[in-house]
């Protein structure tokens, strides 16, 4: 091996051994803390070091995909999730956030700028926390062995509690739990120098002279006299490089300060310093003087003429402008002491018309007033005026068909939507018997919209219009869907022509359509969509790792990251930070039992340790700037320096960074988000969630199957088939109760769809769910056709009545016979189900009839309302129902012992706006009380 390679390696080896034997530095390898005992010992060492050492070094090497981020390392209170110390990477805007608990008990956040950490390659990081035994601490951030930013004079660190077991250590807490990032190392160096910490990640910082001398002496002994000259030159070279690196570091710090100053000036604008006395904040006629004390000015004495001394006494003149009250006259000092002139503030907003421009907010202040932004429904400002926002009611004309209604988008874009029971492009609508979004007959639409084409199954919902054999008859109603001359009921490949009906294995699928023709697989699962069924595919998820070696066989994870070392990769681990090889999840909430605390203060379905807003309900967990703080409790969602609401906000593009706040048309929406508020490349008019870049369209292709009676005697599980790119679901079996639940969680939501039982046999339950948090906590809308007592009277008798029911499920027992009978029973079941509303008509569903539902849920106020249509007629309306059992959750469909059910033309849309009928209901409730 070449000498130039041997020497550096020996240097590192020697110094590493030297430091490991030294009492001045201790190193904690965070990724090797696998159990409570090891973690507690590490916390005790760290807590002691914080009282004795001057510096703490946090080192890490990791790989993070571009623009992603998450929490790299953190110390938390196990009880209330309080952050003692947290280090988060915000790759989207190149920041490292350091959050810690100050000595006064308050949280403090430091932004370290421009660390390019999310570039899809391995990075090394050192965070130096200096001055631990002083009144103020300093931070220095090194990336790839270079200083990139620092912060001085910060509030001191509170330290750690004496009970080491109460502190939780986490790494990669947020984004690393599901993304394909890789954390190679996270280590804490307690004490020592930058040079010693640098050796942990192969950064050759210049150390002290004693170390260098010891290294030289031992290296000479190893290599002999022939290399002394070369070693000497290398030492001198390293010293020169160290000096140069120190100079560059100082220059980098100075440039960082200059850069930050420039950025702040760009946000605030370049202007001359403004006088605190312009305009004069003091009373009229009173002088104003600049002052170094808060608030930056000082007012002179009040005008003498307000109190006039007379020959026989005194008189008080009229109250100052902005106040009202009587004048006062009197004689003698005692009279003046007993009688005071009282001046009361005038509410200019109430008493003076025209104080602000019409349709704007007027704010009364003591002695004056100020004008705010335009009122709701109006756009503009105090300069140009406030004008009515464009609405369907103010158009003055109707662009829509007589059987459609007008919808106004976020940016006053007008669109027309056909009414229930009608279909078309909105400008032209025709009858739609099966309510799947396609008219019975073709319509003469100018834009050639696909929804103007005639329905190829006019009486059976098929919102995808699938037609395998191209004969103009949709698969859903075609007796021979593949056109091979064999009827569907007899065809072992219903959608693939195969006249020979060859079937080499024992399942019900012919070879022509069997993705494992020689291995029985009735479910035909094909996770990676490569045409080869999972049961015979050596790489089920298609990530290039064979199943026998893949720690997540069904979820692509080429990096094979496994932080807890349990053999289950982070990408599919329900407890990625806790050793849990069994992966048990009894309540089906996607959190493994070993780390499932079921502590959820805000009731949004996310336990406090995983909730990015633990005290504010936010089931969507939206975090637009990826800073670890959910938008619902983040004062600056896009982290552009403009607060969402408070001055100098409100931010006119809350989710898109725009410190300039340019708004050319003065409509209150910034130019950068004018037509795409969340910047997800889908215009707001077409976006299912215009204020969430994570959701753009209705899609149930990825769903979780939940069995509600896993121990039932019949034990027939539902068979779910998803069509139309996730907007249609079909259930084919006469099954035990079950759910198909999408993975997208919502705060406020509008959920709609068409339900159709495509058979004349059986008479049991069909419906849908919302607010799903786990298999014991969800809302369900369920509909029985006829009255029937459940055939198993244990554990209790359950009677189902016909009609639509809205239930809140909060089960003590979870999936099993108790919950099964409670769902079947019409009414309340203590500890299991609460009946919130039942259709008083007591009418069951009809065979082969289509019904359209509209469900509105606003968990922030507990508002629920269900409307059901048969054809064009509204046949059931729950009215306003108030319940806050679940504060948001996921959506899905439900069936219980009913086969051949179609949920078609499904649609959801994020909506947190409070409906008008809730306000009316609220007023009525107040009047009653």
UniProtKB/Swiss-Prot annotation:
Residues that carry a glycan: 45, 381, 618, 911
Gene3D superfamilies named among the record's database cross-references: 1.20.5.10, 2.60.120.200, Laminin, TSP type-3 repeat
Residue stretches making up the Laminin G-like domain: 24-192
Cross-referenced PROSITE patterns: EGF_2, EGF_3, EGF_CA, TSP3, TSP_CTER
Gene: thbs3b
Functional note: Adhesive glycoprotein that mediates cell-to-cell and cell-to-matrix interactions. Can bind to fibrinogen, fibronectin, laminin and type V collagen.
NADP among keywords: no
Annotated source species: Danio rerio
Signal sequence range: 1-22
GO molecular function, one term: calcium ion binding
Domain named EGF-like: residues: 345-384, 388-430
Family: Belongs to the thrombospondin family.
Keywords, sorted A to Z: Calcium, Cell adhesion, Disulfide bond, EGF-like domain, Glycoprotein, Repeat, Signal
GO biological process, one term: cell adhesion
TSP C-terminal domain span: 701-915
Compositionally skewed regions (Acidic residues) per UniProt: 624-641
GO cellular-component term (any): collagen-containing extracellular matrix
Subunit structure as annotated in this protein's UniProt entry: Oligomer; disulfide-linked.
CDD domains, sorted: EGF_CA
Compositional bias (Basic and acidic residues): 602-613
Ranges occupied by TSP type-3 repeats: 431-465, 466-501, 502-524, 525-560, 561-583, 584-621, 622-661, 662-697
The protein's name in its UniProt record: Thrombospondin-3b
The keyword Cell cycle belongs to this UniProt entry's keyword annotation: no
Pfam families given in the database record: COMP, EGF_CA, TSP_3, TSP_C
């Amino acid at each position: 091996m070449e000498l130039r390679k041997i020497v550096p390696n020996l240097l590192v080896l020697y110094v590493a051994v030297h430091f490991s034997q030294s009492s001045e530095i201790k190193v904690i390898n965070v990724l090797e803390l696998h159990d409570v005992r090891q973690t507690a010992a590490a916390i005790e060492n760290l807590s002691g070091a914080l009282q004795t050492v001057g510096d703490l070094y946090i080192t890490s090497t990791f790989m993070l995909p571009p623009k992603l981020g998450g929490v790299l390392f953190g110390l938390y209170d196990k009880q209330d999730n309080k952050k003692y110390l947290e280090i988060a990477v915000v790759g989207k805007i190149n920041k490292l956030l350091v959050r810690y608990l100050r000595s006064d008990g308050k949280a403090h956040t430091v932004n370290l700028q421009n660390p390019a950490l999310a570039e899809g390659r391995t990075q090394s990081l050192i965070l130096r926390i200096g001055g631990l035994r002083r009144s103020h601490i300093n931070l220095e951030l090194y990336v790839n062995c270079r200083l990139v930013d620092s912060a001085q004079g910060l509030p001191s660190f509170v330290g750690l509690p004496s009970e080491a077991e109460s502190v939780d250590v986490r790494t990669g807490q947020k984004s690393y739990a599901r993304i394909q990032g890789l954390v190679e190392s996270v280590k804490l160096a307690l004490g020592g120098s930058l040079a010693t910490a640098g050796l942990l990640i192969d950064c050759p910082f210049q150390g002290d002279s004693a170390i260098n001398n010891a290294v030289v002496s031992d290296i000479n002994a190893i290599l002999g006299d022939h290399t002394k000259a070369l070693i000497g030159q290398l030492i001198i070279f390293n010293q020169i490089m160290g000096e140069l690196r120190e100079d560059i570091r100082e220059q980098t710090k100075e440039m960082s300060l200059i850069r930050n100053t420039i950025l702040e000036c760009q946000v605030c604008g370049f202007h001359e310093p403004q006088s605190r006395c312009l305009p004069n904040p003091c009373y009229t006629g009173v002088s104003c003087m600049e002052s170094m004390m808060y608030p930056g000015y000082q007012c002179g004495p009040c005008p003498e003429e307000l109190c006039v001394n007379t020959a026989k006494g005194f008189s008080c003149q009229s109250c100052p402008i902005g106040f009202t009250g009587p004048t006062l006259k009197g004689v003698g000092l005692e009279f003046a002491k007993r009688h005071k002139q009282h001046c009361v503030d005038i509410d200019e907003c109430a008493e003076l018309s025209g104080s602000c421009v019409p349709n704007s907010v007027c704010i009364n202040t003591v002695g004056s007033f100020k004008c705010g932004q335009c009122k709701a429904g109006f756009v503009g400002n105090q300069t140009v005026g406030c004008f009515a926002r464009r609405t369907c009611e103010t158009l003055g004309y109707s662009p829509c068909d007589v059987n459609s209604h007008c919808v106004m988008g976020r940016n006053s874009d007008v669109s027309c939507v056909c009414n229930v029971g009608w279909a078309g492009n909105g400008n032209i609508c025709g009858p739609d018997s099966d309510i799947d979004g396609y008219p019975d007959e073709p319509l003469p639409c100018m834009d050639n919209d696909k929804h103007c084409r005639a329905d190829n199954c006019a009486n059976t919902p098929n919102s995808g219009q699938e037609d395998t054999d191209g004969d103009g008859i949709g698969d859903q109603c075609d007796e021979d869907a593949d056109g091979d001359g064999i009827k569907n009921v007899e065809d072992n490949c219903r959608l693939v022509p195969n006249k020979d009906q060859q079937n080499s294995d024992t399942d019900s699928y012919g070879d022509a359509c069997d993705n494992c023709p020689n291995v029985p697989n009735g479910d035909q699962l094909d996770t990676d969509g490569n045409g080869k069924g999972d049961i015979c595919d050596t790489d089920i998820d298609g990530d290039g790792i064979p199943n026998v070696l893949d720690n997540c066989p069904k979820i692509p994870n080429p990096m094979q990251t496994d932080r807890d070392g349990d053999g289950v990769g982070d990408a599919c681990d329900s407890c990625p930070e806790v050793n849990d090889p069994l992966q048990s999840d009894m309540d089906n909430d996607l959190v493994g039992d070993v780390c499932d605390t079921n502590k959820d203060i805000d009731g949004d379905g996310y336990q406090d340790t995983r909730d990015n807003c633990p005290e504010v309900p936010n089931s969507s967990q939206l975090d637009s700037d990826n800073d670890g703080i959910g938008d619902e409790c983040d004062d600056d969602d896009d982290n552009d320096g403009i607060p969402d609401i408070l001055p100098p906000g409100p931010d006119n593009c809350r989710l898109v960074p725009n410190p300039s706040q340019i708004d050319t048309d003065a409509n209150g929406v910034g130019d950068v988000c004018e037509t795409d508020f969340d910047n997800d490349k889908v215009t707001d008019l077409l976006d299912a969630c215009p204020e969430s870049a994570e959701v753009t369209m209705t899609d149930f292709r990825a769903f979780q199957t939940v069995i509600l009676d896993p121990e039932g005697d019949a034990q027939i599980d539902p068979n779910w088939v998803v069509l139309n790119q996730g907007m249609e679901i079909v259930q084919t079996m006469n099954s035990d109760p079950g759910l198909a639940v999408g993975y997208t969680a919502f705060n406020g939501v509008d959920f709609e769809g068409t339900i159709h039982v495509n058979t004349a046999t059986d008479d049991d339950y069909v419906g849908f769910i919302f607010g799903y948090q786990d298999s014991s906590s969800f809302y369900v809308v369920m509909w029985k056709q006829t009255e029937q007592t459940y055939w198993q009277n244990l554990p209790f008798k359950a009677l189902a009545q016909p009609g639509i029911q809205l239930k809140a499920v909060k089960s003590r027992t979870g999936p099993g016979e108790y919950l099964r009978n409670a769902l079947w029973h019409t009414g309340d079941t203590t500890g299991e189900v609460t009946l919130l509303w039942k259709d008083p008509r007591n009418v069951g569903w009809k065979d082969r009839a289509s019904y359209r539902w509209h469900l509105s849920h606003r968990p922030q106020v507990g508002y629920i309302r269900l409307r059901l249509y048969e054809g064009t007629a509204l046949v059931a309306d729950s009215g306003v129902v108030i319940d806050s059992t679940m504060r948001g959750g996921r959506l899905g469909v439900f069936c219980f012992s009913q086969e051949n059910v179609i949920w078609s033309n499904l649609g959801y849309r994020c909506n947190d706006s409070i409906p008008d009928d809730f306000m009316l209901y609220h007023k009525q409730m107040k009047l009653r009380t």
